[in-house]
Structures are given as structure tokens and as C-alpha cells.
């Protein structure tokens, strides 16, 4: 009789233990499962500009969770908690997190609303992160493997059993996250000029999340009084007496002079720039020519 009682006691304890751990999350990319604790989540960033905010990452396809109770009889209540914030190169930025139909400021100073989970299959968390747009068409470089955010999550079930999760979000690719209300087609453009005295169009466009009156100006080291010829910075076998000049529809564009683009919306607008050689002082000698020219966008 004592053996039978001991067997029943073991079965009852096992049953209680299974009910208590009635919630599991999974990192979809690695397959790692967990009932509490922290995990590193590597995501491919494909940011895009929006009205007043720019999407950084949609985590709904990266982290999935499910209810482990029989038929979802025990209800799991999930919410994000204080301390969730951007990290790494994005740490200085503010933004927002979308969670289950509501949006909260980042960094979070309080807890979010509760998301109820009764489904017993893995489903993505309704979770997206945004940067607050500042300026025109700026951006911040994110390197592969760099931490971009930490999200804190709390779970409690209808029968108790609270647990905490920490999602450390890392970039899985090199990308420039737009920080302004507009974005450009490329942020590092190499224009290869044919032999002197040729020219080449600069393939750069800009678009905005909503109509903006936009302009831009060029910057770099110039060698003439008009600030229109950019210096040759070639490090080896540099040509002499030659620099690079930028024109727009046939007119020279000096450095630090704002060029008005007019209204720019969701359709890309070409900057209309062409790179060409320009004579400086002294005798022209053959060699390499290289100039580094910045483009800064401004609202007008």
C-alpha cells in the first residue's frame, strides 16, 4: 500500500510541474526554446522611412511564443516592461515600440498593456521597433553583430508562475538606419570617371515618407576661391593640376550652397548631379584623381 501511495504522489507532482511551465518562447532563427531567461536574437535589418518615425525592425518573424497548457486552459499574460530601449549605435536615439495594437515610447519607463496567449502553436510576437525621425535624410551605420536593442518581457499565467524574458536584439547585416524623414538610394556612391576630360552622372535619388520641401548642399575640401573645385585626394600617383567639379543640369554647384529640390514625396527624385574634371592651378600631369564629396539634406 505504501508503494502505491508513493507512485500516486510522484504522478501528481509531475502533473503540477508540467502545468507550471505552461509557456515557451522560441528564437526562430536558431530554434532555441526557453521558458524564462535571456536570449540573443539576430535579425536582418531592412529599415524604411515613415511619417514621423522610421521602421527599424519587425520582430514578429524572429520571436515566437506558445501556451503549453492542455488546450490553452491556463491563460498566459505577456507584457513589455520598463528598461526596454535601443542600444549600441542607436542608444542615443528615441523611438517607439509597437506591441499588440499599442505604441509606447522608447526607452520605456513603464509597462505595456497585456497581450493574452492561449494558442498552443508557436506564433510571432506582435512587436515592431521604430526610430523617431529627426532631420531630413540622416542615417546611422549599424554593423553586423552589433547590439541594437534590449527588450524586457514579463509573463504571468492565470495560475501564477511569473517569469521574465530578456531579448537582446543584434543586427545580422551591415546597414544604414535612416534617422530622418527622408532616405536616399545609396549613402556611399563611387563614381568612376573616364579619362580626362570626361564626366559622369552621379546616380543618387531621395524620397520622403510624406511631401517635404527639400534641399541639399555639397561639402568637402575645395581648392578655388569659388569653392567649386574639390581637391584631388588620391593617395598614390596623384595627378597634378586637376580636381573634381559637380554640376547640375550644366550649372556648377559650389560647396555649401543649398540646392532646392522642391517638394519631394514618396517617388524618388534625382539630385541631377554630374561629376567632371576641372583644372586647378599649375601644369596638368597624368595620374589618379579622387575626391570625397559629402551631400547633406535640409528641410526648406
Stretches with model-predicted labels:
Residues 4-14:
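Sec-dependent N-terminal signal peptides
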Residues 15-19:
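N-terminal signal peptide c-region/cleavage motif recognized by signal peptidases
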Residues 21-300:
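Mature extracellular/passenger domains of Gram-negative fimbrial/pilin and adhesin proteins
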